[in-house]
């Protein structure tokens, strides 16, 4: 059996990935790679990380049999991997705690981050508060309007939130500004990137820290279902919750993997964020991957009701898994996600993040095509408290 062994030493996943950074940043990126490799071999680092995951974040998260949702869908048994139950309400903190510990290991005192929905910003501000690091979060001005509560949360936790008005004032622009800040303050600052994007070693580091999701799911499935699930479904923006869920399953060919992008107002419009369905390969934020771009290679706007999915690129490993057909990628519209948001709330008493609602929507359709002896695991990447106000306004506007 061939084992999956990406990325290679150059940070490539097949033809995707790599490390395309300004000369000024190269030493910092190489330092990070070395610090990470050393940390992996260091028992005390791994023990400290494990302690925080267990005692601070509240892992392991449950694998929950959603019986009423299963009944509603009719078909396969649906299970939810409850990443919404982590401290701060999403999967993001699995990565930020690991990278914050790396920051201390490198002797740096300051952290810079970007955020879209605000979840990564909150998770970064949280661990910086915990570990005594200074924290600056760049956030697009459009996202600041959509996620006022998360902005206040970050400030409450001691972070400085910087509004980004350049470009479309969303996640892509926040990443640009965070990278720019890092270039100018590289000696005392570490950039905690929030997804499996950017130059090597970021996609690998984030994937590895998030892979606790898939590892737990495998063990829990064996206990709860008696076998590995037949299908695993996760939403994909940059793609860190999905990569964390998929990575431990890649060599288990009997498990079908599904990534769900945001189709926004529809794939036939320009208003979507379905990078793999509607994009083409190109260069963004230091990596080669699928992007939403025009014929001249200019990055196009990404649109989604969910602030965490409207990134015009995708992690390079997802591009590779798409090309090799190991993962099947499809998309769900804003309307379908809104329906699933309400459906899970009404059937299970669990309000999902709008991001996760995309996966719930796809999985309920998929379940109908499967039989009751089969099983699907959905990565419920976050809770929906942050989205309730936005959904309320949207539904009232439709009446």
From Swiss-Prot:
Oligomeric and partner information: Tetramer of two alpha and two beta chains.
Membership in a protein family: Belongs to the TrpB family.
PROSITE patterns: TRP_SYNTHASE_BETA
EC number: 4.2.1.20
Cofactor(s) required, per the database record: pyridoxal 5'-phosphate
Entries under CDD domains matching the protein: Trp-synth_B
Keyword flag Endoplasmic reticulum: no
Function: The beta subunit is responsible for the synthesis of L-tryptophan from indole and L-serine.
Family matches, as Pfam families: PALP
Listed pathway(s): Amino-acid biosynthesis; L-tryptophan biosynthesis; L-tryptophan from chorismate: step 5/5
UniProt catalytic activity: (1S,2R)-1-C-(indol-3-yl)glycerol 3-phosphate + L-serine = D-glyceraldehyde 3-phosphate + L-tryptophan + H2O
InterPro entries attached to this UniProt entry: Trp_synth_b_CS, Trp_synth_beta, Trp_synth_beta/beta-like, TrpB-like_PALP, TrpB-like_PALP_sf
Source species, domain of life: Bacteria
Name of the protein in question: Tryptophan synthase beta chain
Name of encoding gene: trpB
Residues found modified as N6-(pyridoxal phosphate)lysine: 92
Keywords: Amino-acid biosynthesis, Aromatic amino acid biosynthesis, Lyase, Pyridoxal phosphate, Tryptophan biosynthesis
